[in-house]
Design a protein with these regions (language model features):
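Glycine-anchored, exposed beta-strand/edge motif detector
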Residues: 2-142
Length: 142
């Protein structure tokens, strides 16, 4: 992957941990969760107020690509600056939630959504490990 995921933890209580093996191949920069089998998955629950999973929290951000069944490196904690996979067109200062594919997106309702990060820079284009074009955004995990 050409894009650095962890920008600066700034001395924040960040941890890079192996919280389990990947359930399927996962790309660096995705918000991740853990399933009932203890496998790491892309955060698949849209964390907006209109869903039953609005209060669910993503575990963190995947630091490096993980092959199916392989150990994962997950950045956990708050106050960490990361480049994460996202939708296009995010605005600096915007509060972001994890969508149903592990990418960050706009918060439609900050009163009920589970805010995961704050956008620090405009969305930029990059490539994933497979060479596909992907959007990234520099964020502060909160």
């Amino acid at each position: 992957m050409a894009t650095e995921i962890l920008v600066n933890d700034g001395g924040a209580p960040a941890r890079i941990m192996n919280l389990g093996n990947a359930n399927a191949a996962l790309e660096a920069g995705l918000g991740v969760d853990i399933n009932s089998s203890g496998k790491i998955i892309a955060a698949a629950d849209d964390q907006t107020g209109g869903t039953s999973k609005a209060q669910a929290a993503a575990l963190g951000v995947l630091l490096v690509d993980a092959a199916s069944g392989a150990p994962t490196s997950v950045i956990t904690g708050k106050g960490i600056v990361c480049n994460v996979q996202s939708v296009a067109g995010l605005t600096v200062g915007e509060e972001l939630v994890v969508d149903d594919a592990g990418k960050l997106e706009h918060s439609a309702n900050i009163e009920t959504d589970r805010i995961f990060a704050i956008c620090l820079a405009s969305t930029f284009s990059g490539t994933d490990s497979g060479g596909a074009a992907t959007n990234f955004t520099k964020v502060l995990i909160i």
